[in-house]
């Protein structure tokens, strides 16, 4: 991916964002929440750890997500090199991670909200698992690429 000087990731969302998120949603999973605990203001034992299996590299060993679920911390091991798709978003996550999350945390009939759609990996996972998704992305370039990615994914599934 190329991050062409975008500055959308220069600060965390506002307190008003988190207040509204908790108002409109029953449960939450928030990636990068370890940088925003001062705004989340809720205890959680049910964090998710994505072990990126980077080995001895300069990149982060993993990512943390806050969850509102009263469960033990869970980890998911997956190296991005297993993905055969080119990355186009700097925080792109694998579809397999979102499928694992849906399998572990979502119930049939749940409606999924993603306020930071990014590359659209969650959209592919929701499509694969049969969940309704409402997604938002502030960057039109990423939004368009995510929509196209989902369109191609859906068309490939209907060919066979």
Language model features by range: what are they?
Residues 1-113, 119-160:
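Class I S-adenosyl-L-methionine-dependent methyltransferase catalytic core
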